From Swiss-Prot:
The keyword Transferase applies. InterPro entries: Kinase-pyrophosphorylase, PSRP. This is Putative phosphoenolpyruvate synthase regulatory protein. It catalyses: [pyruvate, water dikinase] + ADP = [pyruvate, water dikinase]-phosphate + AMP + H(+); [pyruvate, water dikinase]-phosphate + phosphate + H(+) = [pyruvate, water dikinase] + diphosphate. Signal peptide: none annotated. Keywords: Kinase, Nucleotide-binding, Serine/threonine-protein kinase, Transferase. GO terms for molecular function: ADP binding; ATP binding; phosphotransferase activity, phosphate group as acceptor; protein serine/threonine kinase activity. It comes from the Bacteria. ADP binds at G153, V154, S155, R156, S157, G158, K159, T160. Belongs to the pyruvate, phosphate/water dikinase regulatory protein family. PSRP subfamily. Its EC number is 2.7.11.33, 2.7.4.28. Pfam families: Kinase-PPPase.
Amino acid sequence: MPNRTVFFVSDGTGITAETFGNSILAQFAIKPRHVRRPFIDNAEKADQVITEINGAALAEGKRPIVFITIVNDTVREKIGSHSNALVLDMFRTFVEPLEAELQLTSNHRVGRFSDVAKSQEYHDRIEAINFSLAHDDGQSSRNLAEADVILVGVSRSGKTPTSLYLAMQHGIKAANYPLIPEDFERDSIPSSLAPYKRKCFGLTIDADRLSQIRNERRPGSKYAALANCRYEINEAERMMKREGISWLSSTHKSIEEIATTILRDIRPDRLIY
């Protein structure tokens, strides 16, 4: 399918427009060229963006796609009416119908979607990120009582990226610990985790995929050998079943899907969106 240029235009950082737009575009088999244009908050800046959008349409022979999050009606409508593009307006699509339904007027504050720098949510998110970094790959067993979840699984099964995603996106304090051959020989989870077994959630992975990932890191090693990967995975799954630890396979799941499943399982008291 022909590729398109996609603009993310906002009066703030553009992160909301880009996040929303990318989640929609992921449904289609295209590889768009991304152009982010933040802080478009007056008519002069709007004119510059319109010129750029129309230039892309002329050069490529097809209309760009434009996701916008702009609260100023004049600026927003100018871009919508003067651009040779498919303009997808998040405020008109979502905010205006909500205003009608709630019979309330929205704040219409510039940057409101990402105005969290002074909020408690921002503080909680930073605390969660620091916690997850300090407790990555079994580095520390201190303060595990504070953990919302402790991810366990064999090395390279997706624990670290999932932990950081949970921290950054949802303010979840996620530690992660590798299950290693010494644990299998001892036939028990690490002793430091035993008091917090109810917080544990396991990740497993297909042996072929694990071998491929490990060979990228340590090619030709026993660590990456398919037979060793099969052994570690089988032992880890057996241990998690015996210990009553919920687990899932990360083989064909995105980080977002893994995180959503974990959140549904642990049901944290607090959650940041």
